[in-house]
Amino acid sequence: MKNAFRIGNVLCILLVLGVFVGCGDDDPVAVNPPTVDVNEAGSIGIYSDTDGRYSRLTDTGGSVTFHIVHKVTDGATASAFRIEEPAGWVRISATSEFAVSIGNLDDGISIGYGECRSGSIHVMSLTYRSPGNTVPGSTFKVLPHNEWPENVQVVNCGDQ
């Protein structure tokens, strides 16, 4: 992606998620995401809601839907990334909110937003079968696309 703004640190888009079973406790535990240094490119994370407000994800031992949300103030027209899930989680489906997407979540997917968008951009919905016994502290990760391994790619609205 020529002229793409890059999110400089994988940690700025990694959200620690509460994906675990509490030992005999049915009350899921929330884990707050780390402080994020949001730059012009914004941040991309995995949330339990389409607005990117709730990062609590729980292992219920069944089908669970999560959402990839790109939070950006100055606007973006596209992004490229890949997803790494904890051991035992099986992806059932991945649906982009936009018509143009190339690639896959394992090696890397590039998604065009169709126009300049800002705020909380709901990029994708992911449905997984959770194992019911995820190790505490396990995380889902948003990582760089394999074609551009140095950073997650974001096309700023000014780069159209």
Feature names for model-found ranges:
Residues 19-22:
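C-terminal motif of bacterial Sec signal peptides marking the signal peptidase cleavage site
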Residues 1-11:
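Bacterial N-terminal signal peptides that target proteins for export
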Residues 25-160:
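Acidic, low-complexity intrinsically disordered segments
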